[in-house]
Amino acid sequence: AGDQNLFTSLYPTLSQQLPREPMEWRRSYGRAPKMIHLESNFVQFKEELLPKEGNKALLTFPFLHIYWTECCDTEVYKTTVKDDITKWQNVLKAHNSVDWLIVVVESDAKKKNKTNILPRTSIVDKIRNDFCNKQSDRCVVLSDPLKDSSRSQESWNAFLTKLRTLLLMSFTKNLGKFEDDMRTLREKRTEPGWSFCEYFMVQELAFVFEMLQQFEALIVQYDELDALFSPYVVNFGAGGKC
């Protein structure tokens, strides 16, 4: 969300560098941590992409929402950007989407063309006061990301680390909820009307592990599907109903 042209200018570098550094992935239930590389698909913000009530799918909605701005003008912030962020956050809240990040891009070239500006820290402080409450880390500053300087590189690396961390946190949380839903569904398999087709959604979990190159976990998911489905095949072959 936010300044689409700004994001477009940064996207090639972002998509290339985000997966380069591995992240330690710690899961629940005492499972050993794994080192993974995060590859993300960035899509333009649309309300119809947000999760709907009762939708248990894992890969059909965005995990982390990012608002991009390079606003450094007092009046522009008051009259445009603040209202835009408010509307964006209200839509997220309506869909219980709580994982977000506001990126304020600092551009020396843009500041030189403006006269009615606040110091960069003041703009960031305003955004944090208006929207972040106790989550001040949800607003980050990116200093001249397209400029070849040590300051810009340091800022860019810090941003990538923050983005990887938030992506992994959101992914782990959503994955855990999905696993809990599937676990609850599996435990009801002896009840009348239980649907294997609905449970077959767990294959989506296998797709996730494949993308993360966690092949042992992938095999476990397919073995579990096979163990549950085989009795249905045997029962059907004996003249029963699936």
Model-derived features: where do they sit?
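Eukaryotic intrinsically disordered, low-complexity segments enriched for acidic and Ser/Thr/Pro residues
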Residues: 1-200, 235-242
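Short, charge-rich amphipathic alpha-helical segments embedded
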Residues: 215-216, 220-242
